[in-house]
């Protein structure tokens, strides 16, 4: 039944993408809901295929400092290369304007996003407008959580009685462009008694599992009305970090056969449903990096820091629970002081921290199998007297 439902949704999305391809060249979604006055924040984002390396340094950068072969899964020894960590993926990447000629560089504060798509920011009362160009080889979409969307800007195909114009958002065909319009009402922002921001996600939803395992997921941060700087960041924070405790299962990505063919020659040699093969191609990452290979997360003693933490969905529910743990510091999560949180699939959490203990500290998943698989990184707390290295957000 599950496989049948997935096939049905994928087929509906493919039909929607094909039917609207000519009209999608630059189709602006019509936001039917009344919007409150505010800024229109426009993002030019392309879905693109490129290579991604989970271990760019070739070894552990957080614990041992050595190159290792932890990926030699029992049953796969001698057949699969434990050092093969570069895979073809799809990514959301931001451009400077509608020409899609110049990539918008990430600021030093946000280089740690890694594999994730660009951060979408807005203040309550604003409108987010995403111009999505599909440069990939198959249909993709963009579906947001939390913000307001009409049926023609949902980015998801299912039996909802919509047709024609209201289906063009469901799947953007290769080579086509579609504009999603998402108003940001008060219910998309922080609730009474919460902090200055709310945290949501966006992702492709043509086939949610395969799209996300391919790499198409990113963050949305909404700031309370009156609390945002010009760029949308909250005035009451010094640093923000987004961390995805994400299990990327390459055997469930659209590009698995192509990756196996490139790595090993004949894709028919390996059965993607074989347990050993699947486990070998699962990567326990933080923002797409293993073993501390991402940028160092740096803050100063006394900074007002907010962590936005989430986890990916995956077919293996037993692997979907993560327990991020900060060494050396404590944080406040949902009005409770702690140094660890628990996440279920696609769950988001925010943790407020005022670091008081300078040093280099471990940040990792406490599930033993995930920690052993490389789901850890480091963060640095500099003494309060150290000049800020990343002024602004």
Regions found by a protein language model. Give the residues of each.
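Bacterial N-terminal signal peptides that target proteins for export
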Residues: 1-9
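Bacterial N-terminal signal peptides
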Residues: 9-18
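N-terminal, post-signal-peptide metal-ligating segments of extracellular/periplasmic oxidoreductases
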Residues: 21-169, 262-305, 377-383, 387-392
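Solvent-exposed, conformationally flexible loop/turn segments
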Residues: 123-125, 173-177, 238, 300-304, ...
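Extracellular/periplasmic metallocenter environments
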Residues: 131-143, 147-151, 159-229, 341-393
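Compositionally biased low-complexity segments at domain edges in trafficked proteins
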Residues: 233-268
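Long, repeat-rich segments with strong aromatic
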Residues: 298-319
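Intrinsic, low-complexity N-terminal interaction/targeting segments
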Residues: 318-341
């Amino acid at each position: 039944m599950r496989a049948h439902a997935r096939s049905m949704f994928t087929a509906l999305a493919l039909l929607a993408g094909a039917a609207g391809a000519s009209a999608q060249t630059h189709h602006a979604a019509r936001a039917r809901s009344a919007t409150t006055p505010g800024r229109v924040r426009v993002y030019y984002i392309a879905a693109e295929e490129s290579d991604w390396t989970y271990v760019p340094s070739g070894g552990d950068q957080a614990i041992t400092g050595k190159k290792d072969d932890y990926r030699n899964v029992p049953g796969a020894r001698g057949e699969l290369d434990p050092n093969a960590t570069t895979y073809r993926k799809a990514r959301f990447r931001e451009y400077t304007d509608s020409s899609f000629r110049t990539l918008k560089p990430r600021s030093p504060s946000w280089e740690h996003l890694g594999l994730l798509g660009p951060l979408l920011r807005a203040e309550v009362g604003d409108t987010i407008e995403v111009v999505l160009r599909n440069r990939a080889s198959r249909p993709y979409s963009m579906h947001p959580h939390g913000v307001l969307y009409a049926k023609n800007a949902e980015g998801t195909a299912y039996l909802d009685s919509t047709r024609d114009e209201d289906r063009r958002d469901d799947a953007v065909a290769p080579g086509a462009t579609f504009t999603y319009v998402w108003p940001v009402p008060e219910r998309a922002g922080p609730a009474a008694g919460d902090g200055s921001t709310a945290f949501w996600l966006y992702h492709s939803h043509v086939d949610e599992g395969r799209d996300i395992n391919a790499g198409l997921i990113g963050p949305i941060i909404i700031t309370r009305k009156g609390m945002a700087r010009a760029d949308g960041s909250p005035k009451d924070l010094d640093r923000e970090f987004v961390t995805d405790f994400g299990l990327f299962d390459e055997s469930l990505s659209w590009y698995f056969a192509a990756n196996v063919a490139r790595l090993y020659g004949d894709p028919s040699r390996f059965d993607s449903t074989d347990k050993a093969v699947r486990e070998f191609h699962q990567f326990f990452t933080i923002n797409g990096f293993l073993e501390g290979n991402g940028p160092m997360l740096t803050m100063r003693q006394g900074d007002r820091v907010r962590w936005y933490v989430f986890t990916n969905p995956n077919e293996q529910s037993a692997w979907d629970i993560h327990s991020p743990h900060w060494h050396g510091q404590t944080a406040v999560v949902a009005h409770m002081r702690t140094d660890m949180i628990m996440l279920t699939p696609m769950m988001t959490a925010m943790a407020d921290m005022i670091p008081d203990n300078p040093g280099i500290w471990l940040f990792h998943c406490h599930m033993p199998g995930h920690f052993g698989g490389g789901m850890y990184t480091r963060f640095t707390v500099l003494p309060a007297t150290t000049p800020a290295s990343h002024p602004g957000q």
